[in-house]
Amino acid sequence: MALRLEDKQAIVAEVNEAAKGALSAVVADSRGVTVGEMTGLRKAAREAGVYIRVVRNTLVKRAVEGTDFECLNETFTGPTLIAFSNEHPGAAARLLKDFAADQEKFAIKAAAFEGELIPAADIDRLAKLPTYDEAIAQLMMTMKEASAGKLVRTLAALRDQKEEAA
């Protein structure tokens, strides 16, 4: 069924709004994936704070104009599924990477983060970014280890001073 001009403009505006507020984007080819599997993916995406949309290539090209995701224009060929991460930069990449592992027909084309194109082969770089909470936990662990090491060195220095004095 053909879309009217107003419908196309609404789609472009909706995707453009999603792109403006997104931290990263992932483009995939969803040919061969059943409706039930796509419904499961969409549900998981909503829970992860990821906006997913299957959009015509010409419309998605217009939607990403003037955003950090303009670098993805070359990947908009064939059936295009675009996913925008709204809460965490690696959320969409992680979600689609896990989905692609289960679905052999589902293929990730590329991703974009801060205006940089990330090829499908390097999608792990984006998918393995720690979440905010994970990053804070890692920082706290580093600080905790550093302070424990400092304490040990201080106690050793104190012991050495007392031994020299004796």
Swiss-Prot record:
Alphabetized Gene3D superfamilies for the sequence: 3.30.70.1730, 6.10.250.2350
Sample GO molecular function, one term: structural constituent of ribosome
SUPFAM superfamilies in alphabetical order: Ribosomal protein L10-like
Gene Ontology BP terms: translation
InterPro entries per the UniProt record, alphabetical: Ribosomal_uL10, Ribosomal_uL10-like_sf, Ribosomal_uL10_bac, Ribosomal_uL10_bac_type, Ribosomal_uL10_CS_bac
Coiled-coil segments on the chain, per record: none
Keyword line: Ribonucleoprotein, Ribosomal protein, RNA-binding, rRNA-binding
Secretion signal span: none
One CC-aspect GO term: large ribosomal subunit
Domain of life: Bacteria
The protein's assembly and partners: Part of the ribosomal stalk of the 50S ribosomal subunit. The N-terminus interacts with L11 and the large rRNA to form the base of the stalk. The C-terminus forms an elongated spine to which L12 dimers bind in a sequential fashion forming a multimeric L10(L12)X complex.
Family the UniProt entry places it in: Belongs to the universal ribosomal protein uL10 family.
UniProt function note: Forms part of the ribosomal stalk, playing a central role in the interaction of the ribosome with GTP-bound translation factors.
Protein name: Large ribosomal subunit protein uL10
Taxon lineage: Bacteria, Pseudomonadati, Pseudomonadota, Gammaproteobacteria, Alteromonadales
Gene: rplJ
